[in-house]
Amino acid sequence: MKLKSVIATLAVATLALAGCSVDRSGDQADRPTIRIGYQSFPSGDLIVKNSRWLEEKLPNYNIKWTKFDSGADVNTAFIAKELDFGALGSSPVARGLSAPLNIPYKVAFVLDVAGDNEALVARNGSGINTIAELKGKRIGTPFASTAHYSLLAALSQNGLSANDVQLVDLQPQAILAAFDRGDIDAAYSWLPTLDQLRKNGKDLITSRQLAKDGKPTLDLGAVSDEFASAHPDVVDTWRQQEAHALKLIHDDPAAAAKAIAAEIGLSPDEVAGQLKQGVYLTPEQVASPEWLGSEGKPGNIAVNLQSASQFLADQKQIPSAAPLQTFQDAVYTKGLPGAITQ
């Protein structure tokens, strides 16, 4: 292998592991390992992790949970073949399935639909009261995330482009620090960081409002093509536990909040308030034509992702949009709806 190729490979692997933490408690060397990438936004993913449902249902596997700060980082880890499953937003997925990334993974679950749990917040004292007043201002957001996508959509709705503002690529915790120091004037981010931003700022627009205007964003669970082909039984178990978590959010929100709180270091009451800001589907809705669809019949989520890809291309974030067929082929419908609704 040429030196340049070796360096490139090492660089990708290093990026995949940057800014993430790993939970490998209980690993045994004689078992295969399932590698799951998660993020700290409130979702059923954190309930599954905290409750150790996968460890219980898959005793012959090690379960390796790795925390990532954004969907862009999750994409990088998939490219480096460091993940089997990963939680990331619809915009990173749309980017990942489009050229030049062309990541070989499939959308296998809808974790949540962004509502008031993602928002554009202007800092108190910045003098900004409307999106139009952001012209020339510094705005922090994690690049290639759903928040970045929503920010571009919000700017576009108000006659602005990325060239009219100063975009700063920051992860959520870095956004909070820069916001509090006054280094940035506004930020588009998600929970739990978002609630901290709101203590010293005000919402200009939320992702719930953008969804009503035709620019919805989602948090999704993806599985690598290679893993899905080799271990469809594990994919079924994983989907069933995610469906179980959604049921818990609906049926026993206090228990759901307690499990999530233990993972992100907040009180159950704080998490309970945050859960009310998102939109959590039922398993039946996840497997409906509006979202994933049924076996052999990919749902409307493919249209949503293609629309996001087209928007990213229009904003010159990617070279060109992928066709609808690309996204339909990337929806994992095996066994739906029964696989997650029984």
Task: List the model feature ranges, each with a label.
Residues 91-92, 168, 173-265:
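Pocket-lining segment of extracytoplasmic ligand-binding domains
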Residues 63, 162-165, 265-277, 319-326:
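Short, surface-exposed acidic
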Residues 304-342:
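Conserved C-terminal helix/tail region of periplasmic/extracytoplasmic solute-binding proteins
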Residues 57, 77, 81, 95-99, ...:
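Structured segments of extracytoplasmic/periplasmic soluble domains
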Residues 47, 67, 71, 86, ...:
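Solvent-exposed, acidic/flexible segments
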Residues 230-314:
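Secondary-structure end/capping motifs
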